[in-house]
């Protein structure tokens, strides 16, 4: 096998490991706010549980990255997939905030390892990195896009906990993909001491998480909750599944476009278009701009990892990928809190226009810093 073919195979297996584990998390995002009583928590506690996996990643991503690099993909992903299955079983059998909180923290670290593996293996060979990573994002999204509507329908008949027993078995199937991964360690850079200011890619990652994973997703649910008929859980599950379906269909296309035209150029172009769509979303063109944002987000997903790999070759690549993920998690954690505070009291146009302009500025700064 050529090095490119091996990289394609390893990236696919890593993506399948994450794709079979991820439904545990996305179903909890769908069901916990609606059925928090069934899980033995208040709505406020449900919000903390949903944020806990991101908060622990902000603190623990560096530790995960060092252990991932030291032990290699196979041990890291086997442990992470096993942890995902444990978390799913716990969601099915346990109730109460203090019993569910450790599961969310464990899942946060497990996701960090799986996500880092998909990015590192997707960019390990520079040739075709954007195409390879875009294809791996499609494999990752396959699990959630199937699990969300199935889980919504099962919940209506069997309650919100039964689906997690099914997802435990699905996650365990991910062990087969994880076993096929390489076990060789990755080179580790020297540990840096002291505070490092965010660079242009950090800033873009933060704003991307803030706008698209935070303000937009919460706004889509908050503003569109009365615009579609049918049961609330089915409608919400359909909306969330559409987001992942967009990744399946469009992320490979975005990767091929990045290989052809350059990931930095595509980053600027798509970010500017996203900024325009966000302004329209906040100004009243709700469904048309929401659809455009879903498309643009899916096209953008394969861009950042190849840019990071190109700018940070060698031992620093894994830590650089982890740093970008931390900043995106910070933005995605701040975004829902901002949306919850501002949407009931502030004009929609301003809520989305200001972050849109900042996102466009950050994308342009990424290209300028590369020169």
Q: What name fits each language-model region?
A:
Residues 6-34, 197-216, 291:
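Pair of pore-lining "gating" transmembrane helices in MFS-fold secondary transporters
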Residues 59-92, 258-264:
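Conserved MFS/SLC helix-loop-helix module at the cytosolic interface between two early adjacent transmembrane helices
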Residues 105-140:
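Cytoplasmic helix-loop-helix junction between adjacent transmembrane helices
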Residues 264-304:
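C-terminal transmembrane helical hairpin of 12-TM major facilitator-type secondary transporters
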């Amino acid at each position: 096998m050529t090095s490119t073919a091996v990289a394609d195979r390893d990236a696919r297996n890593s993506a399948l490991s994450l794709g079979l584990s991820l439904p545990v998390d996305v179903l909890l995002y769908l069901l916990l706010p609606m059925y928090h009583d069934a899980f033995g928590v208040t709505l406020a506690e449900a919000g903390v549980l949903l944020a806990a996996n991101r908060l622990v990643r902000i603190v623990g991503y560096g530790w995960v990255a060092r252990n991932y690099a030291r032990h290699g993909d196979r041990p890291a992903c086997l442990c992470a997939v096993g942890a995902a299955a444990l978390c799913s079983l716990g969601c099915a059998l346990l109730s109460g905030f203090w019993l569910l909180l450790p599961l969310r923290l464990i899942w946060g670290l497990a996701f960090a390892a799986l996500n880092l593996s998909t990015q590192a293996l997707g960019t390990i060979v520079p040739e075709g990195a954007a195409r390879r990573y875009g294809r791996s994002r499609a494999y990752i999204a396959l699990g959630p896009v199937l699990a969300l509507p199935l889980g919504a329908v099962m919940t209506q008949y069997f309650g919100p906990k039964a689906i997690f027993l099914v997802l435990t078995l699905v996650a365990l199937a991910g062990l087969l993909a994880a076993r096929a991964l390489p076990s060789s360690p990755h080179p580790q850079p020297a540990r840096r001491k002291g505070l490092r200011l965010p660079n242009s890619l950090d800033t873009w990652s933060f704003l991307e998480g803030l706008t698209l994973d935070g303000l937009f997703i919460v706004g889509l649910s908050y503003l569109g909750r009365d615009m579609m008929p049918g049961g609330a859980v089915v409608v919400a599950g359909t909306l969330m599944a559409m987001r992942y379906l967009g990744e399946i269909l469009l992320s490979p296309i975005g990767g091929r476009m990045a290989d052809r035209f350059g990931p930095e150029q595509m980053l600027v172009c798509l970010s500017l278009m996203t900024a325009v769509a966000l302004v329209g979303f906040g100004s009243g063109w709700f469904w048309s701009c929401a659809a455009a944002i879903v498309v643009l987000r899916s096209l953008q997903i394969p861009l950042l990892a190849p840019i990071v790999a190109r700018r940070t070759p060698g031992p620093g690549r894994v830590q650089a990928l982890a740093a970008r993920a931390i900043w995106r998690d910070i933005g995605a954690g701040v975004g829902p809190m901002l949306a919850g505070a501002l949407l009931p009291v502030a004009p929609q146009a301003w809520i989305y226009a200001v972050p849109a302009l900042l996102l466009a500025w950050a994308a342009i700064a990424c290209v300028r810093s590369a020169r």
